[in-house]
Amino acid sequence: MSPSTTTIFIGPILAVDAAVSHAIHTAAKPFLPPFVLLLLEISADFRFSFPVSLSFLLSPPLRSFLVPFLLGLLFDLIFVGIVKLIFRRARPAYNHPSMSAAVSADHYSFPSGHASRVFFVAASVHFFSAAAEASMTGPSYSFLDGWIRDHNDGDVKVEVVVVVWIWATVTAISRILLGRHYVLDVAAGAFLGIVEALFALRFLRFDEMIFGR
């Protein structure tokens, strides 16, 4: 497909996406709680989420989840960066870097790295909970285990899964409200995050190799 043909098909879609995204941002701007939205931005930043997740390795029963999870976070960072370099879609013109709590590592908009990351986290927790790994049915080793585990069946507590999904959804929407991304950027990022979670939990399970039994 030639560049001109691509423009004919993609151009109108991007134009509608930009118009809808700007309308949402403009309508919501007077009511936005900047402090809360910036906290959401920080919570989903890789430089915050990765070290925090890394510290959870102190809980042995969680390692079967955390090893593919941490590798998945790294994969997400690299893969989304490559996709951004391929598409090179500029961020919205009304995006104000001065309002950002996190220093942006790039100037490209598609897909949203924050959206992919938070949906990767939410999907990973959800899928791991549904799988009910055998290693999670053992005795609790720390306060952390008791906080997130349901000792009736060893699974991750439903409340934790629900809270993580709510956090992911609100954070993803905040990217549009803050003017960081367009709607399609966030939708694509969310989709990639879920696919990456499936990939990580299936193909990046090296916990036995790293920690042994």
Swiss-Prot record:
Quote the SMART domains the UniProt record gives.
Answer: acidPPc
**This enzyme's EC code(s):** 3.1.3.-
Q: Which CDD domains match?
A: PAP2_containing_2_like
Q: Where in the cell is it found?
A: Membrane
GO cellular component labels: membrane
Q: Record's SUPFAM superfamilies?
A: Acid phosphatase/Vanadium-dependent haloperoxidase (SSF48317)
* Cited Pfam families: PAP2
Instruction: Tell me the GO molecular function terms.
Output: hydrolase activity
Entry's transmembrane regions? 30-50, 67-87, 118-138, 158-178, 181-201
Name assigned to this protein:
Probable lipid phosphate phosphatase beta
Species in which this protein is naturally found: Arabidopsis thaliana
Organism ancestry: Eukaryota, Viridiplantae, Streptophyta, Embryophyta, Tracheophyta
